[in-house]
C-alpha cells in the first residue's frame, strides 16, 4: 500500500487551555489507512482531551483538524443507559446508524451472550466495556478513536480486542488509542503528550 | 395454628381448607348484612334518608382500609426483624387488596356525602384527605416494589415504606376528634364502647365480619399464588444451574 | 435528512422515561399530590377552589415538567450517551426535539389527559369545556417541556442543576401560562387567546430545539 | 458516639447543596417562580389571592423539598460516596440526618425565611403574624425534608426515581401539611395545632433517619 | 512470622444470587497479616460483588464473614463529588476518620500536587484513581480491599501503588485485590471465581 492515499485524519497546531493553564500545544498528527497511533502521557497529560478534540466533541483553542472519514469514539464512559441491556443498546445504535449487522453474532463475538439481557445498571465493568466495543462492529467506519481500550477487560477480552483492532487495520482502517500498557496490535507511531 | 403461618408448606395446607371457608362465611355475612341494611332496618333521616344504607358497605370498607394497612405494617415489621418469607408474601398480597377496600371506602363515602353534606369531596377535611393518602400509600408501596430489581430488595424497600407510612393510620382514626370535620366522630369503636342503636349495630358488625373474612380469604389466595410463583422461580434456577 | 437516528433517539428517551418505575402513573401521582396539597392549604370554599382550579393545574403542569426534565440531559452527559448522539451525523436539534417529545408523551400528555378529572376535583361543573381545556393543557404543556428542555440542557453540566433549571425555564413559561389561563377564563380579550397559545407553543417547538442543541454541544465540550 | 464523621457528612452535604450554581438563590427562584405563575393562573382578585397565599407557600415548600432531595442520595449511590459513608463506623441514621439537615439549611430554611415576602406578594397585611408564620413554615419544611429524604433514599437506586419519590413522600407530608395549615388559618380547634405541628416534625426527625439508613443500606446492596 | 496470629478476615461458604442465577457459591478465604490475595476471574465472574460483600456492603445469600480488623475499600467508583477537589476530599475524610496525617505530603506522594485544586468533575481518570488511593494513606488500617487497582494509572502510578502496597504488607497489613494483570507486589494466594 505505497499508493499515496488521502489521510483519514490530519491535525496540526492543536492547543487547549484548561483552568488558565495550557494543557498542550502544537500537537499535530496524520493518520493514513492501516495506521495505528498510540497516545502516551502521564495521568492528566491531556490524552482524553485530545481524543475528544479529534472526535469533534471539544473545541480546540488553536489548530486545525481535518477528518474526512467517519469515525467511532469509545471514551471512559460507555454511553449505556441504566435500563438498556447490551442487546437493546446494540439494536438501538444499529437502527440509528442504519446498520444491518447481526446483533446476535456480535454479542457472541464479544462473549456477551450471558449478559445480553442484563440491564446496564447491573453489568460488570468489563461487560460495559465489551458492550461499547460491540458498537465498533455494528458499522464499518475507517477511523476508531479509543480511550484506554484495555481498561477493565480480562485476558480473553484483551486478546479479542487486539484481534478486532488488527483486523480493522489490515482492512484499511486506522486507529488512535490512548494507552498506559504495551499494545497488542501493530503500532505505527507513538505520540507523547 | 400460628405455626401454619410461619411455614409455607403448612400454610399451603391450611389455606387450602381455610380460604374457601373464609369466602363462604364472608359472603354469607355480607349478604345478610346487606339484606338487613337495604330492606330491614329503618332509614335514618338525620343521616340522609335511604342513602344512609350505604353505611353497610362504607363502614366495613373503612375499617378494613385501616386494618389492612396495619396488617401491611405488621407483616413488614415481622419480615424486617425475623426475615420470615411468609410475612413478606403476606405484605405483598395485602397491598392491592387494601387499595381496593380503601378505594371502596372513598367511593361510598363520596356517594354518601353528596346528598348529606352537599359535596362529593371536601378538600380540607382531615379524614377524607388522610384516607385518600392511605390509598396513595398503597399505590406507592406497589410502585416501589415494582421498581426494584430483585425480590429481596423489593421486600426490604417495601417494608421500610410500609412501616414509615403507619403514621397515617392513627391520623385517620383520630382525625375526626382532632379537627373540625364534616364527618361524624366514631360511634362504634370508641373508648366507652359502641353508642349506635342495636338495629344498626348488629348488621353493621356482621357485615364488618363478612368483609374481614372475605378479605382474609383473598389474601390467602394471593399468598398461595405467590408461594407457588416463588417455588417455580427457585426450581427454574436450580434446573438452570444443572 | 435521515430520520433513523431521530427515531432511535425518540425510542431511547421513551424507554428511559418509562424505566424509572411505573411510567406515566408517576407524574400523575405527582400532579394528584400537588392538587391535593393545595386545597389543604387553601381551604375548601367551593368558589375559591373553582377560581384557583385551572391556575393550579397550570402550575402543576409547569412544575412537574421541570421535575421530569431535570435529569434528561444531565444523565446523558454523565453516562456518555450525549457524546454518541453528538456524533450521529443527524442534526442535534432534531435529536433534542425527539427526546423532548418522547418525555412529553410519557409524562406531559398523561397529565393533560388527567386534567378534566382534576378540574372536577376542584369543583368545576362537568361540561364539554373540560375536554376543550384538555386540548389547551396539552398544547401548553408541550411548550413547557420544550422550554424546560432548554433549561435542562443549559444546566446539564452543573450537578444538582434542577433549581437552576427552574430559574431559567420559569420565565420562558410565562407567555404560555398567560395565554393558557386567558384562553380558559374567557375574559375580555380572550377570543384570540387559544390562537396565541398555539402560536406560543409553535414558537417554542421551532426555537427551543436549536437552543437545546447549542447548549448540549457546550455541555459536551 | 464519635461526632466527627457526622459533622463531616454535614459539611460535605452543605458544600454539595451550594455547589450546583448559586445555592440558596435557586430555591428562592423556584418559590418566586411558583408565586408568580400562580396568580397568573388565578387572576389578581385581592380576596382570592389572600385566601390562597398560605396554601401556595406550603405547597411550594413541599414541592421544592422534593426537587431538592431527588438527587441527594441518588448522587451518592452513583459516584460511590455512599459506600464510603456506610463504612465510616458512625451510625448511618446520624449521617443521613446530618445530610438532610444540611440540605434543609441550604434550601428549606431560605424558603421559609422568604415566606413573609411572598405572603406580602399575595396581598397579606403586613403584621407580626407573618413572622410567627415564618416559624411554622420553618418547622413544617423540616418535616418535609426528613420525609422527603426517606422517599429519596428509597428510590435512590431507581434512575429518574424523582417521581417515585413524590408518590412515596407526599402521603408522609400530609400530617404536617394538615397541622401546618390548621395552625395558620386559626379556625376552631386550631389552638393545639402549632404544638401538633411541632410534634409531627419531632416525630419525623426521630423516625425518618432510621428509615433512611435502612433504605441507604439497601441502595448500596 | 510463624507466630499464629488471628486472621484479619475470614469468610466461608459465601454465595450470592444475581437475577435468579447463582453468581458464585462456596467461596471461602482467610487472610493473615502480611498476606495478599488476588481475585481472578473473567469479566462478570463476580469479583466486584465478592469484594463488596467482604467490605460489608452487599449481603451474602449464604455464608459467614468475620472481619475483626478495620478496612479500606476502593471500588470502581471513586467516591469523589463533582465539586470536591482532591485536597478538599482528603481533608473531609481525614476529619471524618479523625486522622492527623499531612494532606500536603500525601498529595505529593501521589503526584497530585498539580491537580490538588481541580474540582472532581474535571479530574482525569488517573487523577481520580490517585485521589481514591490517597485515602489509603490517610489512616492506617490493616485490611485493604481494592477492586482493579491498576485501572487508569500510568506507569509511574502503578510503580508508586506497588510500593505503597508492598510497604503495607511488610508492616503487617493485608490486601485482597481483584486484577486482570500481573501483580507488582508479593502475592500469597490467588482465588479464581
Ligand atoms: C369520602 C368521604 C369519607 C371518608 C374518606 C370516610 C372515611 C371513614 C372512615 C376512615 C371511617 C372509620 C372510622 C373509625 O372507625 O373510627 C368511617 C366511618 C364512618 N363513616 Fe365515613 N367517610 C366518608 C364519608 C362519610 C359520610 C358522607 C358519612 C355519612 C354522613 C359517613 C358516615 C360514617 C359512619 C356513620 C361511620 C361509622 C363511624 C363509627 O360509628 O365508628 N362517612 N368513615
Ligand atoms: N477546569 C479545570 N481547571 C484546572 N484543570 C483542569 C480543568 N479541567 C481539566 N483540567 C485538567 O486537564 C487535564 C485533563 O486531562 P485528561 O483527562 O485529558 O488527561 P488524560 O491524559 O486522559 O489522563 P488519564 O491518563 O488520567 O486519563 C487534567 O490534568 C485536569 O486536571
Ligand atoms: N439483576 C441482575 N440480573 C442478572 N445478572 C446480574 C444482575 N445483577 C448483576 N448481574 C450479573 O452479576 C455479575 C456481577 O459481576 P461483578 O460486577 O461482580 O463482576 P466482576 O468479576 O467484577 O467483573 P469485571 O471484571 O467485569 O469487573 C455480572 O455478570 C452481571 O451481569
Ligand atoms: Mg483519560
Ligand atoms: Mg468488577
From Swiss-Prot, chains A, E:
GO MF annotation list: ABC-type heme transporter activity; ATP binding; ATP hydrolysis activity
Disulfide topology: none
Signal peptide extent: none
Enzyme class: translocase
InterPro entries: AAA+_ATPase (IPR003593), ABC_transporter-like_ATP-bd (IPR003439), ABC_transptr_haem_export_CcmA (IPR005895), P-loop_NTPase (IPR027417)
One Pfam family, short name: ABC_tran
Name of the featured protein: Cytochrome c biogenesis ATP-binding export protein CcmA
Taxonomic classification: Bacteria, Pseudomonadati, Pseudomonadota, Alphaproteobacteria, Hyphomonadales
Catalyzed reactions: heme b(in) + ATP + H2O = heme b(out) + ADP + phosphate + H(+)
GO biological process, one term: cytochrome complex assembly
Amino acid at each position: 500500500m505505497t499508493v499515496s492515499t488521502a489521510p483519514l485524519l490530519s491535525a496540526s497546531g492543536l492547543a487547549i487551555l484548561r483552568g488558565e493553564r495550557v494543557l498542550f500545544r502544537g500537537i499535530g498528527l496524520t493518520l493514513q489507512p492501516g495506521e495505528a497511533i498510540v497516545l502516551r502521557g502521564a495521568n492528566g497529560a491531556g490524552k482524553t482531551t485530545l481524543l475528544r478534540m479529534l472526535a469533534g466533541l471539544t473545541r480546540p483553542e488553536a489548530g486545525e483538524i481535518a477528518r474526512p472519514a467517519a469515525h467511532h469514539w469509545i471514551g471512559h464512559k460507555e454511553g449505556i443507559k441504566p435500563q438498556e441491556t447490551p442487546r437493546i443498546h446494540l439494536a438501538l445504535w444499529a437502527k440509528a446508524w442504519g446498520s444491518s449487522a447481526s446483533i446476535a453474532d456480535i454479542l457472541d463475538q464479544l462473549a456477551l451472550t450471558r449478559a445480553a439481557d442484563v440491564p446496564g445498571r447491573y453489568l460488570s465493568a468489563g461487560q460495559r466495556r465489551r458492550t461499547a466495543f460491540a458498537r465498533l462492529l455494528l458499522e464499518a467506519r475507517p477511523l476508531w478513536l479509543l480511550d484506554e481500550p484495555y481498561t477493565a477487560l480480562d485476558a480473553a477480552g484483551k486478546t479479542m480486542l487486539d484481534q478486532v483492532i488488527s483486523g480493522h487495520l489490515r482492512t484499511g482502517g486506522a486507529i488512535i488509542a490512548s494507552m498506559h500498557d504495551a499494545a497488542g496490535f501493530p503500532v505505527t507511531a507513538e505520540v507523547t503528550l | 395454628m400460628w405455626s401454619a403461618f410461619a411455614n409455607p408448606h403448612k400454610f399451603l395446607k391450611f389455606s387450602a381448607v381455610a380460604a374457601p371457608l373464609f369466602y363462604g362465611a364472608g359472603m354469607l355475612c355480607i349478604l345478610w348484612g346487606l339484606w338487613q341494611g337495604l330492606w330491614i332496618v329503618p332509614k335514618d333521616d338525620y343521616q340522609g334518608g335511604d342513602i344512609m344504607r350505604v353505611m353497610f358497605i362504607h363502614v366495613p370498607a373503612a375499617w378494613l382500609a385501616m386494618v389492612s394497612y396495619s396488617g401491611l405494617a405488621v407483616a413488614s415489621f415481622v419480615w424486617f426483624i425475623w426475615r420470615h418469607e411468609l410475612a413478606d408474601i403476606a405484605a405483598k398480597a395485602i397491598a392491592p387488596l387494601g387499595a381496593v377496600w380503601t378505594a371502596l371506602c372513598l367511593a361510598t363515602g363520596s356517594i354518601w356525602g353528596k346528598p348529606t353534606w352537599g359535596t362529593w369531596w371536601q378538600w380540607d377535611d382531615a379524614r377524607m384527605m388522610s384516607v385518600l393518602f392511605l390509598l396513595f400509600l398503597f399505590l406507592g408501596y406497589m410502585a416501589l416494589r415494582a421498581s426494584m430489581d430483585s425480590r429481596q430488595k423489593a421486600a426490604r424497600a417495601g417494608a421500610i415504606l410500609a412501616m414509615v407510612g403507619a403514621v397515617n393510620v392513627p391520623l385517620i382514626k383520630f382525625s375526626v376528634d382532632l379537627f373540625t370535620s364534616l364527618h361524624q366522630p366514631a360511634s362504634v369503636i370508641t373508648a366507652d364502647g359502641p353508642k349506635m342503636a342495636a338495629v344498626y349495630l348488629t348488621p353493621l358488625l356482621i357485615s364488618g365480619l363478612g368483609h374481614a373474612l372475605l378479605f382474609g380469604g383473598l389474601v390467602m389466595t394471593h399468598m398461595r399464588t405467590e408461594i407457588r410463583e416463588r417455588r417455580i422461580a427457585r426450581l427454574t434456577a436450580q434446573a438452570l444451574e444443572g | 435528512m435521515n430520520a433513523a437516528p431521530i427515531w432511535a433517539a425518540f425510542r431511547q428517551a421513551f424507554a428511559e422515561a418509562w424505566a424509572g418505575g411505573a411510567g406515566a402513573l408517576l407524574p400523575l401521582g405527582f400532579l394528584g399530590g400537588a392538587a391535593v396539597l393545595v386545597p389543604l392549604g387553601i381551604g375548601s370554599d367551593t368558589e375559591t377552589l373553582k377560581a384557583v382550579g385551572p391556575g393550579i393545574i397550570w402550575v402543576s403542569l409547569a412544575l412537574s415538567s421541570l421535575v421530569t426534565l431535570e435529569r434528561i440531559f444531565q444523565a446523558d452527559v454523565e453516562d456518555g450517551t450525549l457524546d454518541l448522539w453528538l456524533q450521529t451525523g443527524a442534526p442535534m436539534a432534531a435529536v433534542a426535539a425527539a427526546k423532548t417529545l418522547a418525555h412529553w408523551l410519557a409524562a406531559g400528555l398523561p397529565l393533560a389527559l388527567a386534567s378534566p378529572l382534576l378540574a372536577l376535583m376542584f369543583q368545576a361543573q362537568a361540561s364539554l369545556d373540560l375536554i376543550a381545556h384538555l386540548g389547551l393543557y396539552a398544547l401548553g404543556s408541550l411548550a413547557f417541556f420544550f422550554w424546560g428542555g432548554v433549561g435542562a440542557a443549559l444546566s446539564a453540566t452543573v450537578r444538582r442543576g434542577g433549581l437552576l433549571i427552574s430559574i431559567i425555564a420559569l420565565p420562558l413559561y410565562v407567555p404560555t401560562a398567560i395565554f393558557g389561563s386567558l384562553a380558559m377564563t374567557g375574559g375580555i380579550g380572550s377570543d384570540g387567546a387559544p390562537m396565541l397559545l398555539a402560536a406560543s407553543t409553535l414558537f417554542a417547538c421551532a426555537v427551543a430545539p436549536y437552543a437545546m442543541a447549542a447548549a448540549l454541544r457546550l455541555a459536551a465540550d
